[in-house]
Amino acid sequence: MVAPVLETSHVFCCPNRVRGVLNWSSGPRGLLAFGTSCSVVLYDPLKRVVVTNLNGHTARVNCIQWICKQDGSPSTELVSGGSDNQVIHWEIEDNQLLKAVHLQGHEGPVYAVHAVYQRRTSDPALCTLIVSAAADSAVRLWSKKGPEVMCLQTLNFGNGFALALCLSFLPNTDVPILACGNDDCRIHIFAQQNDQFQKVLSLCGHEDWIRGVEWAAFGRDLFLASCSQDCLIRIWKLYIKSTSLETQDDDNIRLKENTFTIENESVKIAFAVTLETVLAGHENWVNAVHWQPVFYKDGVLQQPVRLLSASMDKTMILWAPDEESGVWLEQVRVGEVGGNTLGFYDCQFNEDGSMIIAHAFHGALHLWKQNTVNPREWTPEIVISGHFDGVQDLVWDPEGEFIITVGTDQTTRLFAPWKRKDQSQVTWHEIARPQIHGYDLKCLAMINRFQFVSGADEKVLRVFSAPRNFVENFCAITGQSLNHVLCNQDSDLPEGATVPALGLSNKAVFQGDIASQPSDEEELLTSTGFEYQQVAFQPSILTEPPTEDHLLQNTLWPEVQKLYGHGYEIFCVTCNSSKTLLASACKAAKKEHAAIILWNTTSWKQVQNLVFHSLTVTQMAFSPNEKFLLAVSRDRTWSLWKKQDTISPEFEPVFSLFAFTNKITSVHSRIIWSCDWSPDSKYFFTGSRDKKVVVWGECDSTDDCIEHNIGPCSSVLDVGGAVTAVSVCPVLHPSQRYVVAVGLECGKICLYTWKKTDQVPEINDWTHCVETSQSQSHTLAIRKLCWKNCSGKTEQKEAEGAEWLHFASCGEDHTVKIHRVNKCAL
């Protein structure tokens, strides 16, 4: 089998912050499906890898549902609804997309879907019955048979909304029944009669909006679990009403019955619904309830009577009836502790109930696994994580061992490979969250291997250094020698970091601070009840990636410096290759505010202000030989600054303007978003919203002339879409051509090679090599592409003769991806 040219090897993401966007497939080794921005992600929790991305929605995915098979085999179809007003039916084969069918008709965002396989007496072939609810106050019912989809019916709720949906079949019949949980605090029950759904009941009892409903069949009875913002869970029992004419003593107290009659195959059947129980255990809104799915064990179909609920009180509860009394009791309660969190949106069982997962308010997933020896004990497990909003910037560490990302979710995250001695496969995970900020983060740059500077929607740049506890855990997880890594670090490294009660900056915690903490008993005796525990950090040695609770509190990096000088929000920052000089720029509408500030990374003093551009500088890049600084701007021009060879006094300029373009000489007609240098520092590349990529040069660092006119040295490459990111590989193609990655506003990444042909004008200098497939692409604008330093230390040794290049991408679709390229196959 021929190896692909481009592979996506690792993906980092998390579910959208909405209810119902997470669903676990039934059947053995079921996949977890969740919506990330506009994508549906299929994740394998056992292998801990993203299997594929299903891209088809054009706005946020709000709800997902696997279609369960009656025989307990793995699901191969799922439905999703999004803010683009459409429902998509996905068909999966061998964990890859086979077919997608779009269901259009809603006039508002779709936020609830459900589907079942339906067998009709008149037609032996299965059809799929799909129901969806949207913000247009309508519930639509669809029938899909083969490639054909037909809208059967629209249920209109006037000014109300159906917030939760679930389909099933009435006991001993093939008649579909639909439960709709509404904002009128009622559950509306519909049954299909003559191909039309008719309302048969309204169940009252909840005192606030219904957030979740789900059917489950136990023997000849059908049970409905419902949850609400009134903090309660109700379980309703639906059964065939006895037709016996036996007289009943009216003096006996019995539950109120809601009855209705259905005609099935010309036979009228009476059904009754009673309230089975009310479960009170949560202290805030209950957002989701789910029954444990049916599964096969030793060839026998099992249907455990267990219910899982998730609430905004930060807990998830597993309920089950007592074997002796039949009273429903709380079996297990799990949740998250500490941090800036606000509870759970959703929860799911895996196929046999041995694992449960919760979806938290800030997008994080929490996975627990049942102990095989002690079934009442559940332990946290490793699960995928990522940003819950747009990812704005990323950078590899100088040795290519990990990546750091920043996003508009106000977090900085560090991802690294987890190497296990007993497994050959290397998986990447989030191992630290160095910065949890109060502003949207915009940019970052590495100063050395364990130090970075970040910029946010504020006027200040912040510098962070890794604490000792991070370095220890990083070495343990990635399988590196701690002594080798620590030999290049200061001996007085802090242990960790914490945020003071009345502070906003990460404060270093040293060994003495930890040792002086009182014991729990001492604290109880001496505390007046009003003190705030200043040092929340506790060092811990990890041998595997940390859980979300640990990431929130124990992986902060201390802030070592603030850099003041800009008048508006920081927009971009970069560092030279020797890590001695930092350049930063902020948002600007005037020339004086668009100045680039150069900082000394040892003294942290301002070295120089470079004034040229009239609008925001969007990106900067030092040349690899450190002779030049390139800047591109929203004013559609670029400027090139040359480092002076003479040793200047402290306050004299270090860089002088070497070359620039103006409105006449600029090839670009729109904002220039990105720029990068060739590895030999001869040429630089610019990418713009006008869909053009241009190469400029040559840049001669020995030229001492005052005025320079550097023009395009390539043909203008039209990539067919707005360019938002450009990155040049530090390794040349075997044919001595430059390898260029171009990221587009639509989320696609294209790889080209370029070589100067010395023809006038330049022709055939660009070669299109490969582009990302639909599942590999991002779904929104790419914000940054970054090639890895090609040492290849963190990846498996590939077969002889195949050399892989690695680059990372991030975008507005909340996703970070690591791709690998076969250099020889380009």
From Swiss-Prot:
The record ties this protein, via Pfam families, to:
WD40
This protein's pathway reads: tRNA modification; 5-methoxycarbonylmethyl-2-thiouridine-tRNA biosynthesis
Single GO cellular component annotation? cytosol
Impact upon substituting residue 689 to A: No effect on interaction with ELP1 or ELP3
Swiss-Prot/TrEMBL keywords: Cytoplasm, Disease variant, Intellectual disability, Nucleus, Repeat, tRNA processing, WD repeat
Q: A single GO molecular function, which one? A: protein kinase binding
> Effect of altering residue 636 to A?
No effect on interaction with ELP1 or ELP3
PROSITE patterns cross-referenced by the UniProt entry: WD_REPEATS_2 (PS50082), WD_REPEATS_REGION (PS50294)
Q: Where are the WD repeats?
A: 13-53, 56-100, 105-152, 158-200, 205-246, 281-329, 339-378, 386-425, 436-474, 565-609, 612-651, 667-706, 712-753, 777-826
The UniProt entry, under InterPro entries, shows: Elp2, WD40/YVTN_repeat-like_dom_sf, WD40_repeat_dom_sf, WD40_rpt
Disease field: Intellectual developmental disorder, autosomal recessive 58: A disorder characterized by significantly below average general intellectual functioning associated with impairments in adaptive behavior and manifested during the developmental period. MRT58 transmission pattern is consistent with autosomal recessive inheritance.
Q: How does it assemble?
A: Component of the elongator complex which consists of ELP1, ELP2, ELP3, ELP4, ELP5 and ELP6. Interacts with STAT3 and JAKs.
* Domain comment, as recorded: Folds into a two seven-bladed beta-propeller structure which is required for elongator complex assembly.
Say what the protein does: Component of the elongator complex which is required for multiple tRNA modifications, including mcm5U (5-methoxycarbonylmethyl uridine), mcm5s2U (5-methoxycarbonylmethyl-2-thiouridine), and ncm5U (5-carbamoylmethyl uridine). The elongator complex catalyzes the formation of carboxymethyluridine in the wobble base at position 34 in tRNAs.
The entry sums up its family as follows: Belongs to the WD repeat ELP2 family.
Q: What is this protein called?
A: Elongator complex protein 2
Gene source species: Homo sapiens
